Amino acid sequence: HKDDDEVLIALGEIESELNAKKYGLVWERDEEAVDIQMRDNIPVFTECVDKEISTTTGGVNFLLEGDNLHSLRLLEKTHAGRIDLIYIDPPYNTNNKEFIYDDSFVDKTDAFRHSKWLSFMHERLLLVKQLLSKNGSIFISIDSNEQAQLKLLCDEIFGEENFVDMISWFKEASPSNDAQYFSNDIEYILVYARDKSVWRPHRLPLNEKQMKYYTNPDNDSRGPWNSATYTCNKSKEQRPSLY
């Protein structure tokens, strides 16, 4: 009966909605041609012997030139779980710059530019995760245009519990006086650990100038230290509102 069919269709749609994702990113996913090609093909890289740079320090480093998805697929087979640190500088998908998706430039008028960018990043970050060692971490440069989307995407792939921090850095030496609204001087670096419970940063040692502020008059076993006040270093007369 037609009415019964319509009811069944409506119930099916309701069930789909109930089973749908409740929180996180939802976008129009689209496979690139390179994804389809690699279902039945394995990327092979050819060594350029004439471009080899020999050193006497030992160890072998190499530079892969080509589609980054091809490179990641290859590294997945040779370096899975072996890389301690990854830094990537993906396309920012800004309005004044285009990026290539599926061998075509995606311009600012493309209605699916954000979905294409997310699909682009999703496939690559899934592979990147497989490369990280247990103590590994990834640093990802981004600006405000896709920072919010990238954070949710990385939470989904690496796990929200493995988010380390978001570093803000000044990309401009001085504010832009010709900005229409606010001067956009900051970009970001998202930091995720493969397993935050075991990841530890490698801190830089203090230089001689920095060390002169630290002493160890009481022979503390933990090393030189510097005393500091836990409150504001202003007097009651200078900052009465703090007292």
Report residues per predicted region.
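DnaQ-like (DEDDh/DEDDy) 3′-5′ exonuclease domain used for proofreading
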Residues: H1-Y87, N93-W117, E123
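Short, solvent-exposed loop/turn and secondary-structure capping segments
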Residues: L75, N95-D102, L150-L152, A179, ...
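Beta-sheet entry/capping signal
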Residues: V60-F62, R82-Y87, N135-F139, Q147, ...
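Conserved nucleotide-binding/hydrolysis micro-motifs of P-loop NTPases
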Residues: P91-T94, N145-Q147, K171-S174, D195-V198
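Flexible, glycine-/basic-rich loop-and-beta segments that form/coincide
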Residues: S174-N233, Q238, L242
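RNase H-like polynucleotidyl transferase catalytic core
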Residues: V164-S176
